Structures are given as C-alpha cells and as structure tokens.
Amino acid sequence: MINIRKSHPLMKIVNNAFIDLPAPSNISSWWNFGSLLGICLILQILTGLFLAMHYTADTTTAFSSVTHICRDVNYGWIIRYMHANGASMFFICLFMHVGRGLYYGSYMFLETWNIGVILLFTVMATAFMGYVLPWGQMSFWGATVITNLLSAIPYIGTNLVEWIWGGFSVDKATLTRFFAFHFILPFIIAALAMVHLLFLHETGSNNPTGIPSDADKIPFHPYYTIKDILGALLMILALMMLVLFSPDLLGDPDNYTPANPLNTPPHIKPEWYFLFAYAILRSIPNKLGGVLALVLSILILIFMPLLHTSKQRSMMFRPFSQCLFWILVADLLTLTWIGGQPVEHPFIIIGQLASIMYFLIILVLMPVTSTIENNLLKW
C-alpha cells in the first residue's frame, strides 16, 4: 500500500513541499530565512489576532485600548511587545532574504523574484499601517507625512490623499480603514507566500555556487527541517531577548504620547526598517522627485535580472562584485543611520551622497564590474 502522505490529496501537497522535496546538498544558512519569514508571519498573525480582540479602532479610545492591553489584559504586555518587535524580526529576515537573493543571483527565477518584490511592498504597507494603530504622536504624524507624499502625484494627488484619509486630515475614518487593511493584508501576504513557494518549487532552489544542482539533490526532510528548526530557535531566542529585556529599544518615545494634531514632534521619523528609504526620500529637495526615488529604491529590485551582465549566476567566484555588494550593504546602513538624524549639516550631504551611491552601485557599477569580470576570464 502506498504511503498516505504520498496518496492523500492534502498530505501530498505538504509532502512535496516540505518532506520529499529534492533540495541542493550545499545550501547554506542563508537559505534559512524563507522558513523564518513563514514563522514570523504566523507569529504576527497570531499575536495580532489576540491584540485585535482588545483593541478599538477609534481616535478617542485607540491609545487607551493599547494601554489597557499592556496593563489589564492577561499577558497583554508580552503579546503587544512580541507583535511590535516581531515586525522588526520580520524585516531583519526580509533584508537578509533579499540580500541572499542579490548575492547568489536568485533573481534569475523571474516569477519567484517578482512575487517576492510584490510581497516586500505588501509587508511594508502592512507594517506602516500597523504603526499608525496605537495612535501615539509618531503614529499620527507618520501617517500624515507618508500619506501626504501621494499629493505629489500630478493632477490627481490631492484628491487621492483626501480619498485615502476619508476626510481633510488623518482622523477617525483613516484609523478605522487602516485597522481594516492591517487585519486583512497579512492573509493576502500568506496567500502570496504560497504562490511564491509554488513558483520556487517549479524550478527548485538555487545554491551558493549558482550552478545547476540536479545531479546532487537530498530530501528536504530530515536535513533541512532540522536546520530550519535550529534557525527558528535562534530567531525566537533573539526575539524573546528583545521582548523581555528591552522591548522599547527599537520604538520611538514619542509614541507614548497620545496623538495631538496641534503639536508636531521635532523629528518625525518612521520605524528603523524604513529609515533607508526615508533618507533617500529626504535627500531630494523636490517633492515628486523624492517620492519617485523612494518608490524606485525598492522597485529597482524588479530590474535586477535585466541588470545581470555576468556569465556566472552567483557572486561566489566574483571577488570584485562581492566588494561592491558589501559596499552596497554599508551604504544601506549609512542611509538607515541618516534617516534617523535631523535635517541639518552634515547629515544632509551625507544622505545625498549615500543615495547617489545606492543607485550608482546597482544601476552602473555592478553591471560594469560583471562585464569586466567576464573579460578577465576571457568569456
């Protein structure tokens, strides 16, 4: 009799995706982040569900309801901080996952990569709307500043912003719809992640060498299930250290002040994981130009397969491209730092130079370096 896991219609899908899946024998820990992102998503949906049971999406009571969760609900404080810091872990894993894709040329799986970029945008939208919900000062002013960027769109901009607000300013209608979207989007993300996985399993995983690994495959279980469990334990350890020892480390103190439309905080800034894009936005003096640069800073990932000029897929055997990649990482860290600084000398010029470097490396230096490497190898 055939094994039930291979014959049952539902079990068969799970089996082909997580048990008998042929995987390359040499994938490193950089391939752990996909499963970690899945765990982050499940964790966020569960903690979010329990928070939603006690939260009220109304401008008069939103801030109080979050305080109530932390003070009066059984283990409410840990659920709230796991959700807030879980978002940070989510983005750490996301950046590592995308960085892995760039380094090892995983973007050559076009459908998988494009759905990944759509997922990145969706997660960023979800995180932004979630940050508005506690209705603190930074929630309110962050929502005002970011939604206002859409007014830079010619002709329809102002109407679009007022349509999103549901009025003439960020108010009750805005908060209610942001809560609705923040609740539904994670489920859309889960569905997209399954499509992401579906397309990945059409081609099989890439590996560090970038060479086809059809000749040397091993079953996903037990080799990579045990490896993923180790990664998950380490991530949960890091998350719980953050939650239990310094839950407010990555938050903004301004968000412990209830939202006040009459009082603008001295420095409006988003959560740390958006700071690099925020720095790029601020480095361009023109409003529309800044918005375009902001969108392009992420959308540029879509063009990675077109910018790939090397005859090799991975950067494993390309030292010059490796140097450029790590300069790009350093540049992104610089942008993240600048995004959190006030708009004054010398931060303005550093931000502008780092923004130029970001686009220069991706659009010019990497393709040129790849071509030079091809010529050095007489290819």
From Swiss-Prot:
Membrane topology: Multi-pass membrane protein
CDD domains found in the cross-reference section: cytochrome_b_C (cd00290), Cytochrome_b_N (cd00284)
Keywords linked to the UniProt accession: Electron transport, Heme, Iron, Membrane, Metal-binding, Mitochondrion, Mitochondrion inner membrane, Respiratory chain, Transmembrane, Transmembrane helix, Transport, Ubiquinone
Primary location group: mitochondrion
Record's cofactor remark: Binds 2 heme b groups non-covalently.
Positions bound to heme b b566: H97, H196
Taxonomic superkingdom: Eukaryota
Cofactor: heme b
GO biological process: one example: mitochondrial electron transport, ubiquinol to cytochrome c
Pfam families assigned: Cytochrom_B_C (PF00032), Cytochrome_B (PF00033)
Positions with a binding annotation for a ubiquinone: H201
Protein localization: Mitochondrion inner membrane
Binding site for heme b b562: H83, H182
Bilayer-crossing regions: 33-53, 77-98, 113-133, 178-198, 226-246, 288-308, 320-340, 347-367
Record-level Gene Ontology MF annotations: metal ion binding; ubiquinol-cytochrome-c reductase activity
Gene Ontology CC: mitochondrial inner membrane; respiratory chain complex III
Family statement drawn from the similarity comment of this UniProt entry: Belongs to the cytochrome b family.
Record's miscellaneous remark: Heme 1 (or BL or b562) is low-potential and absorbs at about 562 nm, and heme 2 (or BH or b566) is high-potential and absorbs at about 566 nm.
Summary of the function given for this chain in its UniProt record: Component of the ubiquinol-cytochrome c reductase complex (complex III or cytochrome b-c1 complex) that is part of the mitochondrial respiratory chain. The b-c1 complex mediates electron transfer from ubiquinol to cytochrome c. Contributes to the generation of a proton gradient across the mitochondrial membrane that is then used for ATP synthesis.
Subunit and partners: The cytochrome bc1 complex contains 11 subunits: 3 respiratory subunits (MT-CYB, CYC1 and UQCRFS1), 2 core proteins (UQCRC1 and UQCRC2) and 6 low-molecular weight proteins (UQCRH/QCR6, UQCRB/QCR7, UQCRQ/QCR8, UQCR10/QCR9, UQCR11/QCR10 and a cleavage product of UQCRFS1). This cytochrome bc1 complex then forms a dimer.
Record-given protein name: Cytochrome b
Protein species of origin: Antilocapra americana
Gene (name only): MT-CYB
